[in-house]
């Protein structure tokens, strides 16, 4: 059966839910899709559809980032439900790297928790420009003053990481009670249930507060691969978000990663199971490639306009080292330290060869809370660029966040 064509009528925005484990991110995502389905723009998804990986269902927590789509009257959204569990912040980094804005979910019963802070730190680092707050589980809080305190705490936390804490829209509600109302009556309308109305209020805030991004359509095409599939009879598909540029059927593209550097031709482009004539920066797409075996390519590689970028192993970067309270290390580290560097959708081990303090004096030991310049050599080449953001991880912890300041050939 032929796929329907994707019609590009409204601005396309990538958004996501972030926040501490069990504060209600996936339930809220389900409630949003049900709310927008009831006004006719979206296919509703329940919690089980979004919490999709088998190991997630077993644990009841979200592991891989999951994409759903929905529309408001003003925009078309791709929504990534980011995992809240500490082991899976790796996926949060790749999910957040795709966000034009975020919904920070905080339980009104618990207030901000360690991962709330860690997700805010990461959102800032990977360049999420703005967020809206949903204080969830309002039905579990008897005293309205507690909700006011939670709101103040969240605003202060956002301000401390250079988000507009005073201006950020904060909506309180119960994702679960809204979702239950939709399950009872999928046709429920605005004004018929106070919990449902809070979900509409949230999406009105997202529409008005999160700016429509300016896409880098005129730059050379680049997409980091998030996943790879094989479609029998058609070939290999790489999925991801187009970071910049545009792509159409028949274009030549280069696959870069590790020791691989190979040119191929685009034979198909899809977004949310609909065909596209062309993909542009900001689109979450699947790109079908001619003559490529699934085993040749992997998550973390990039698809680019041929000869527009070189794979490198060495660079200098400006780095902030997270404090213990932010989820970072409790002790410092020395030259020779070998953590993982998370860049776009890849992670690769690298050695720190040199460190300078913020006044350019050589450092032997770097401590949590420091801002430093470091020279790094990765164990394998990746597509590196100046001003790229990355995270540094070690043993399940995010220990630092940086920006590439210089490429070394």
Swiss-Prot record:
Domain tr-type G positions: 10-214
Highest rank taxon of the organism: Eukaryota
Gene Ontology biological process terms, A to Z: mitochondrial translational elongation
PANTHER family according to UniProt: ELONGATION FACTOR TU, CHLOROPLASTIC, ELONGATION FACTOR TU-RELATED
Source organism of the structure: Helicosporidium sp. subsp. Simulium jonesii
Binding site for GTP: 19-26, 81-85, 136-139
Chain residues that bind Mg(2+): 26
Name this protein carries in UniProt: Elongation factor Tu, plastid
Top enzyme class: hydrolase
Purpose: GTP hydrolase that promotes the GTP-dependent binding of aminoacyl-tRNA to the A-site of ribosomes during protein biosynthesis.
Statement: the UniProt record of this protein carries the keyword Amino-acid biosynthesis: no
Region G2: start-end pairs: 60-64
GO molecular function: GTP binding; GTPase activity; translation elongation factor activity
Protein location: Plastid
Matching Pfam families: GTP_EFTU (PF00009), GTP_EFTU_D2 (PF03144), GTP_EFTU_D3 (PF03143)
Region annotated G4, chain positions: 136-139
Region span, G3: 81-84
